[in-house]
Amino acid sequence: MTLENAQQQVDEWIKTHGVRYFNELTNMAMLTEEVGEVARIIARRYGEQSEKESDKNKDLGDEMADVLFVLICLANQTGVNLTDALQKNLDKKTNRDKDRHKQNEKLK
């Protein structure tokens, strides 16, 4: 699935099952909540905190997909083409950082 397909599928899902998009501020709050759920899994599974028994069956991929879903909703609402935005962002990073990371002694 491409980002463009994902944006179309989310839009269709919202129109078919969700009635309408939540407003942008509500979706921003939801995005923050979903990112927090990903952070909790990462912190407990890969960080120094112990993982609670109730968190051991949480699916990291599913939580990341929740983040992506809400991000796509926000992109659709605000007219952002994620394919174009990601390409521009990668181009910017490539031009800005093409030698920076290679020269970073901490990464060697």
Where are each of the predicted segments found?
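Flexible "arm" and connector segments at domain edges
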Residues: M1-M64, L68-K108
